[in-house]
Design a protein with these regions (language model features):
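Intrinsically disordered, low-complexity Ser/Thr/Pro/Gly-rich regulatory segments
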Residues: 1-180
Length: 180
């Protein structure tokens, strides 16, 4: 079992607003070995030169000392992409369609924001780890087939789905291999 921060009880997971995130939390916690460290609901404030400070957040950051880190954005329910409009949406249990933020862009921005945030710290810069592997992926735990959502900017390897909840290690290995 991996280390996951923060460590939540089953009661706390049941109270999360996103049960999709709770599903992925349990899968990563129980399915990754000890050499991984997973951070859940990571937030930051980032200021770039003359710009205003901006808040950021990612659902999961999966870290490995030899592999690097991957930022994962999770979306629950039926998730789809309308290629004619470029819009992402979810479908709830009442079959209602809801526009959602682009999860691919969210994960991509998180990947670079975390790198920028780390580079703010002299201790990190002193480590000379400029080439740490970093990647991004999305996880849709209520979707059965990742291939249906594959796009040029998000190949199916980088899309976790319901079947990957049963073997998250294989999926994470494939994600790191894609970026490595």
């Amino acid at each position: 079992m991996t280390t996951i921060i923060p460590e939540l009880t089953d009661a706390q997971l049941a109270d999360l607003p996103s049960q999709a995130e709770a599903k992925v939390y349990r899968a990563l916690r129980d399915g990754l070995p000890r050499d991984f460290v997973v951070f859940f609901q990571v937030g930051w404030i980032l200021r770039r030169e003359e710009e205003q400070a901006k808040d950021g957040e990612t659902d999961f950051v999966v870290c490995h000392p030899d592999l690097g880190y991957v930022c994962i954005e999770v979306k629950g329910g039926g998730v789809g992409f309308d290629s004619s409009s470029g819009e992402w949406f979810s479908i709830d249990r009442h079959h209602q369609k809801h526009a959602i933020n682009n999860p691919v862009n969210q994960a991509l921005k998180a990947k670079y924001s975390i790198r920028s945030k780390l580079n703010e710290y002299q201790r990190w810069r002193d480590l000379s780890l400029a080439n740490v592997l970093r990647g991004h992926a999305v996880f849709f735990p209520d979707v059965g087939d990742a291939n249906a959502l594959s796009r040029p900017d998000m190949p199916s390897t980088l899309i976790g789905c319901a079947k990957d909840l049963h073997d998250p290690k294989a999926w994470i290995d494939a994600v790191f291999a894609h970026w490595g």
